[in-house]
């Protein structure tokens, strides 16, 4: 098939003064071949609350979407960055307010207090998410495939879910109470617990959604992607010398050279999970593999006590899908 560059479309809420609200912004990457593309937000500066959905192949071309939650848009610029190595394409699209630009607000009237509900063309939208790497690769965890329905209207709030594994219906999913969103629509989530071996063997999981606002049910399917698997290399680094006079120091874990980009990284100390760490999203390297960083902030007194800190990595390319690298303050330093 011929290499085709993607078209990129920023997606913004319809109207309303959202400067003090949390909003979800999107980026549609459409009509490209072959895989993969990478999507970052503000060149990676926005990494929390980012969801990039699996690509869908239709008529020989791929399409995917990515979303980010922002509490500062539109006063702070949010840009979707898309890279498609196969076509040497790099595209940056700023998410701008629709319906009249930055100064536009909803029409006001004596009896209305909320922004009008946006017209929902075709009714609700459905997205399906794979299990988290840690949950599926460590057999003791509770792995789930998740189906998310958004833009459910107040007039037709009831959503019905049906789940199938290799086209056989199952009845073990758990559906959460619907959540009202900032634009007066609802979000509904259903999660299907799955078995480690079912995911790893490539079984197909299908979520079927029905709602009176839909002309017909929507079906979304997901399975473990096929492709090259390469194990990550893991390196841990202590704080720089200049930081040792401060009250808090930073430890860094670099994970590089891995495929696919599904990976889990966390920090532990004395068997307990550390809370004060941040991970970047996986970034595509020049050879097509991925790398990411994890930074743990700890009190300097804990580092000075020579307590060991462990970077724990979960990836399907690793032996037993898991590796740990430990670091502590060296003697005499």
Swiss-Prot record:
GO biological process: antibacterial humoral response; complement activation, classical pathway
Pfam annotation, one family: C1-set
Protein name from the UniProt record: Ig gamma-2B chain C region
Domain Ig-like: 6-96, 124-223, 232-328
InterPro entries attached to this UniProt entry: Ig-like_dom, Ig-like_dom_sf, Ig-like_fold, Ig/MHC_CS, Ig_C1-set, Immune_Resp_Modulators
SMART domains on file: IGc1
Alphabetic keyword roster: Disulfide bond, Immunoglobulin domain, Repeat
Gene that this sequence comes from: Igh-1a
Gene3D superfamilies documented for this protein: Immunoglobulins (2.60.40.10)
Gene Ontology CC terms: immunoglobulin complex, circulating
GO MF term set: antigen binding; immunoglobulin receptor binding
Species, as recorded: Rattus norvegicus (Rat)
Intrachain S-S bonds: 27-80, 147-207, 253-311
